[in-house]
Structure formats: C-alpha cells, structure tokens
Amino acid sequence: MTQDIIDNIAAEGISYYTPAQVPPAGTQVEGSTKLFSPLTIRGVTFPNRLFLAPLCQYSAKDGYANDWHLTHIGGIVQRGPGLAIMEATAVQKVGRITPQDLGLYDDGHIEPLKRITEFAHSQSQKIGIQLAHAGRKASAVAPWLSGNAMAVKEVGGWPDDIVAPSAIPQEEGINAVPKVLTGEDIGVLKKDWAEAAKRAVRANFDAIEIHAAHGYLLHQFLSPVSNRRTDKYGGSFENRVRILLEICEEVRAVIPTAMPLLVRISATDWFEFDDNLTKEFPESWTVAQSIRLALLLADRGVDLVDVSSGGIHAKSAIAIRSGPGYQVHFAQEIKKAVGEKLLISAVGGIKTGALAEEVVQSGIDAVQAGRWFQQNPGLVRAFANELGVKVRMATQIDWSFEGRGKKAKKSSL
C-alpha cells in the first residue's frame, strides 16, 4: 500500500518550527484592487500597500523590547500588512519620549528586537523600524497618565537633560526649557543615528524610517516655531532642513543598498490655515516647504516619504480639521509635485477599505493605519472583505475560513 507524502513544511531560516507561509499573508489571491497589489522598493517587495504605522507602546524598560512588543506586532503581521513598522525607537537615551520607550542606542537592544524580526520573517512578512529622537518632547509620561506632564527624576525621567535646536519649551509652564544642541552635539547626534541604523540592520529589519514629524527633534529643526538658531542649522529653509538631509545621508551610507529608507514628516504645523494662529506664529512649517523638502530627500537616497502633520506646539491641535482622511490631501499635494521621483504614503483617519482604495487610486503609493490596526489586528482582511477581494492570512488562521485541504484518496491493496 502506498500513501501520498503530505508535509507541513517548515519556514526556512527560522530557529524554531513554524509552518511556511506561501504565499505570505496579505497576498491578494482573488479579485483585483490597487490597495492589495504588491509594491517593490529597492530590493524588497511588499505584498500590498496597506502598512502598519508606528505605534508607541510605552512598555519597555531601559529601551529593551519584550513580549508585549512581540505580541503587539505579531498578532498583526500574522494577518498580512504590506509592511509593519515598529514604534519610534530612540537613537539616544535622552531621545526617548518616555522612560518606557524602545531604544537602539546600545548593542544590547539588538537581541530582543531580533526575536521580533525573526517572528515576522517566520510569517514571510516585512518589518521596519522607526528611528527617532524626541528632543524637547522627551521625558514625558505615558499619554494615558497625562496628555502633557513630564516624567520627573523619581520615575526615571530626565527633565534637566532634554535637548532641542533652541531654548524654547514645548509648552510654557509645563515642559522644561531644553538645552540647546551645540555643533558638537549635532555631530554626535548624526553619528548616533547612523549607529542605530547599523544596529537595525543587525537586528534584521527590512526597512528603516527616520522620524521627522509630530514635533519631535528633527521636526523641531524644520519648523521656525521651534528653531531660532543663527548658525548653519537655523534661519533659512536650507539651513533648517540641513540636519535631516545630513542624517539621511549618514543612514543611507551605512545600510544595504537594497534596504528601503523612509522618512516621516509633518506636512504642516497647521498654523498656515488659521488666521489667528498665523498672527501668533507668522513663520511655521508649511505644505510648500514640505514639497521642497521631499524633492531634496529623494536626492539623498530616501525612497518613500510618509506624510503626517502637526505636533510642533500645543496649539497645533487647535487648528487641525479632523475627519476621515483629514490629512490625505497633503500627501496628494506632495505626490503631485514629486511625481515618480519619490514614493508617498498617506496616514490619518483612513478607517475603511473604500477610502484606502480611493487614496491609492489617486496616485498615493501606500496608506498607513495605526490605531485601527490596534483595534482590529485583522484590518487587512476587513478591508479586503469590504472591497470584495480575497486576501490571505497566516495559514493557521486562513484555513478555518477557507476550508480544509483535499481529502486523501483510499489506496488500493
């Protein structure tokens, strides 16, 4: 009597057994949408254009990733985002947003992150990491404790050691006045960003994103609201964007040629759209400047600009006109200007598959969702169902919806 040999094949290159995922979760197997079509950036192909945006978890001790980070990312990657980007991860200890933020400022941080990337790769998924520095917004407490309070020394904070382009606090009377970064400090910062990028490569990430948005350090350099420097890193547009361009060059030089490099920016501080705030802040970061910056980033080896907005000042939130896809039009303006020279992704209020498909059909290359993935790790499948197409999840999940394999035939004696 002969029997067919049917094997639950193992994923290749993984230190433990787990079934191979062929094709990967997130692959469109029936129907046709642009949202679930593949996107190739340099040497990496993403199965679809719905990405997981970075979501800070405020759950680390001394910068080290743990099981919370593994399960947070793991439950989502099993269900197939095109790319999962890990949260803002500090390039310097004083660059953490809170004492509980992730870090890549020490070699010891690599191994816990490798555990997460190995799991993602066991699922044939792509995973990136966002490298960040909070600047004057550092030493905060977790947002569920307070929307603006600082973490004091007694709870591991460093309110006396926060840094910024200029001695201007995020919120007068709430945040400490930051120390001004010297030219020497900026040189160290650039080196530390490059070192963190090298550690990200050693941790086996597939892509790197540089965080220059939401009022954190690099955005603080970009915006005249927070940058009053008189040296080569302040004043003119060319000077204010200099540090970001230099960091992009440093990072691009130390990562593999085939690795995608992303940059997240705030397209605007929002003050340009409010007459009262324009009077209070006559100079701010604007969409027009973001368009100029995007073209310069393309020349520095950046592959994709992830377009968000706001965060530079407590009053930024007052001006924001929220709603479905409330900042997508900024991404569309930038994409129209850069054309095929640069990939652009949109984020913010993209809550439905129909809206996500509409955005990519408009010419945007990818969309990102954050909180909606956190609420529903199966967002990829939910959007696919809404659009009437079939997209795979991990085999262990998918079969319970798609049915068992073919039954074995009785053998002849």
UniProtKB/Swiss-Prot annotation:
SUPFAM superfamilies: FMN-linked oxidoreductases. FMN binds at residues 53-56, 88, 130, 264, 370-371. It holds the Pfam family Oxidored_FMN. GO terms for molecular function: FMN binding; NADP binding; NADPH dehydrogenase activity. Substrate binds at residues 58, 211-214. Its cofactor is FMN. Induction: Expression is induced by the developmental and secondary metabolism regulator veA. Its EC number is 1.6.99.1. It catalyses: A + NADPH + H(+) = AH2 + NADP(+). Keywords: Flavoprotein, FMN, NADP, Oxidoreductase. Disruption phenotype: Fails to produce aflavarin. Coiled coil: none annotated. InterPro entries: Aldolase_TIM, OxRdtase_FMN_N, YqjM-like. Gene3D superfamilies: Aldolase class I. Belongs to the NADH:flavin oxidoreductase/NADH oxidase family. NamA subfamily. NADPH dehydrogenase; part of the gene cluster that mediates the biosynthesis of aflavarin, a bicoumarin that exhibits anti-insectan activity against the fungivorous beetle C.hemipterus. This is NADPH dehydrogenase afvA.
